[in-house]
Structure formats: structure tokens, C-alpha cells
């Protein structure tokens, strides 16, 4: 990993530990706690990634006669190093999200519904229409769930095609995006459209049931293994869809497919994620801003212009 990238990587870990410190202090003050089995599993998974990182570091130092082979292992190592910090930050960020929910600010749900109405959008009508078309419901459900799969597939693609700097940029985008949406949602909390409109089909209101429980103080114990996404405004799924496609921009034949899949994922957030149209539109704006800021400010300062050109653009 180039010196400038190592500095950015170190900064990512510093930010993660800073948020962890905030989590610990805040949790101690309000009696918030983590269920032990979830913590144990999280630690085990993190340790597993660290072990893989160590093995890859050793392999990447082997003096292979084939230079391409040596470079391949170095790119795989870089991808796993960034994956490790992102996985760790994800858990720390989830706790921060739940802590913010406990602040119990007045709900902004009606403001978002009013904004939707001003645009001529009525969420229940769209939901019922999608439900009346099983093939469309299945396609949108698949696209929505692809978000989690892409978190694992994208680093593999970028490692194999030697575009690991693009993956590093994506991880920074992920961290900035997650922090941004949580901070925005702090003074503007909103219950999911599933909850507001009383939708109790499978994988609807049950996926955001923690919102009311932690908001009202009925529980203060979180199982990290069963954590839910509780931020409605803006939509993190929408932001990540933009970042996913952008991360694959230098992988020639995969990029068009990434655009199509993530465009469908953005549409799916309305009915599969229980988001209001205001959530999605704000997510599009926030996503564009995050990509621009990370690229033009954070990443440009960390990596000289000459190094920002991918070493290989392959299919």
C-alpha cells in the first residue's frame, strides 16, 4: 500500500476508534448495553479478518518470480485491509445509530409524507401496486437484498482487476455516508413507512421493530447480530447504490451491469425498504455530494494525481 494510502487507512481506523469512544461514553451514561453473544460473534469475525490480513501480508512478501503474481497478492491484501476497517466501523456505526435513536427527538414523519404529497406521491398506492405484481415484487426484493451481497462482491472484483484504490475510496465513502445519514437523522427521526402505514407483511414492519423499542426506552440492550437499519431520512441504501456503481467505474464490462442493478436497488428502497420518496431523493443528493467530496477533497489530498489512475482496467 503506497505511503499516502497508508496514511488514509490509518485515519480511517482513528475515526473508527473515535466513534467507538463516543459509543462507550454515551452508552455508559444512559445504561445502554450490548448482548454478549452478539459481541462475541463480532469479535470472532473481526479476529478472523485480522488473521486473513496477516496471512495475506506474509504471502505478499514472498519473492515470487512472477511479478504479476506478487502484485495480485498485494492488491488482495489491500482489499482485505480496507474490508477489515469497514467491517469494524460498520458495527461501531450500528451502535452509534441506536444511541441516536434513543434521543427521542420529535418525529419528522409527517413532514416527509407532506413532501411526498406535494410531489404527487402516495406511498401506500405504490406499495399496493407492487404487491399486485408478484414478478415485480420479487425483482425489487432481489435488488434490495443485493446491497449486502455487493459489500462482499465489489472488493473481490476490484482486487482481481487491480483497482484497490477505487475500493479504498469506496470504504471512505461508506464511512462518511453512514456517519452523515445518522447525524442527519438525529434531529429528524422518522418511523418507517411500513410502521406508519401499518404494513405487517413478511420482511416489512418486523425489520424496523427496534425503532420504537429503543426510542421509547422500552429496551436498552442490543444484539449486534440482529441489528436493524433504523435511519429513514436520508436513505443510506440509495447513497450506497450510487457508491457501488461508482466504485466499479473502471471495470469495463461490470460497470454497466452495476448501474442497472443499483438503479433498480434505488427504486426498490421505496417498497422493500419502507422509505418515503423524500428519503430516496435526499439520498441521491447526499450520495452525489459524498462521492464528490471524498473524491475531490479526502482522496485527492491522500493520493497524488499520478497515483489515482488505476494500474489496470480490465473486464
Predicted regions and their residues:
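N-terminal transmembrane-helix/juxtamembrane module of multi-pass inner/ER membrane proteins
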Residues: 6-10, 21-48, 84-151
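Interfacial segments of alpha-helical transmembrane regions
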Residues: 78-83, 152-189, 194-200
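Membrane-interfacial catalytic/cofactor-binding modules of polytopic membrane enzymes
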Residues: 183-250
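Membrane-interfacial, low-structure loops and terminal tails that flank and connect transmembrane helices
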Residues: 1-5, 62-76, 301-315
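Aromatic-anchored segments of alpha-helical transmembrane domains
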Residues: 18-27, 178-186, 262-271
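N-terminal membrane topogenic signal
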Residues: 1-17
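Membrane-interfacial alpha-helical segments at the cytosolic side of multi-pass membrane proteins
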Residues: 153-160, 238-255, 285-296
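Interfacial helix-loop-helix junctions of multi-pass membrane proteins
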Residues: 192-195, 232, 264-290
Amino acid at each position: 500500500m503506497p505511503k499516502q494510502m497508508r496514511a488514509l487507512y490509518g485515519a480511517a481506523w482513528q475515526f473508527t476508534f473515535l466513534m467507538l469512544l463516543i459509543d462507550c461514553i454515551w452508552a455508559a451514561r444512559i445504561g445502554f448495553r450490548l448482548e454478549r453473544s452478539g459481541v462475541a460473534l463480532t469479535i470472532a469475525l473481526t479476529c478472523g479478518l485480522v488473521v486473513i490480513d496477516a496471512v495475506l501480508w506474509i504471502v505478499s512478501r514472498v519473492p515470487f518470480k512472477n511479478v504479476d503474481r506478487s502484485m495480485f497478492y498485494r492488491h488482495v491484501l489491500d482489499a482485505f485491509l480496507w474490508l477489515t476497517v469497514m467491517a469494524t466501523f460498520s458495527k461501531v456505526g450500528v451502535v452509534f445509530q441506536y444511541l441516536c435513536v434513543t434521543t427521542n427527538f420529535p418525529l419528522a414523519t409527517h413532514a416527509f409524507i407532506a413532501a411526498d404529497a406535494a410531489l404527487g406521491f402516495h406511498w401506500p398506492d405504490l406499495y399496493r401496486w407492487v404487491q399486485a405484481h408478484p414478478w415485480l415484487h420479487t425483482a425489487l426484493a432481489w435488488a434490495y437484498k443485493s446491497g449486502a451481497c455487493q459489500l462482499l462482491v465489489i472488493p473481490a472484483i476490484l482486487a482481481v482487476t487491480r483497482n484497490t484504490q477505487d475500493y479504498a475510496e469506496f470504504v471512505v465513502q461508506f464511512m462518511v455516508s453512514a456517519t452523515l445519514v445518522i447525524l442527519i437523522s438525529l434531529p429528524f427521526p422518522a418511523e418507517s413507512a411500513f410502521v406508519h402505514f401499518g404494513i405487517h407483511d413478511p420482511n416489512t414492519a418486523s425489520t424496523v421493530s427496534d425503532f420504537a423499542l429503543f426510542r421509547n426506552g422500552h429496551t436498552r440492550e442490543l444484539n449486534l447480530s440482529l441489528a436493524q437499519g433504523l435511519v429513514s431520512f436520508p436513505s443510506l441504501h440509495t447513497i450506497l447504490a450510487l457508491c457501488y456503481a461508482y466504485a466499479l467505474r473502471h471495470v469495463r464490462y461490470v460497470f454497466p451491469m452495476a448501474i442497472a442493478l443499483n438503479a433498480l436497488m434505488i427504486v426498490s428502497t421505496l417498497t422493500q425498504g419502507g422509505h418515503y420518496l423524500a428519503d430516496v431523493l435526499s439520498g441521491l443528493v447526499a450520495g452525489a455530494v459524498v462521492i464528490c467530496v471524498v473524491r475531490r477533497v479526502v482522496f485527492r489530498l491522500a493520493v497524488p494525481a499520478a497515483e489515482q489512475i488505476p494500474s489496470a482496467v480490465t473486464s
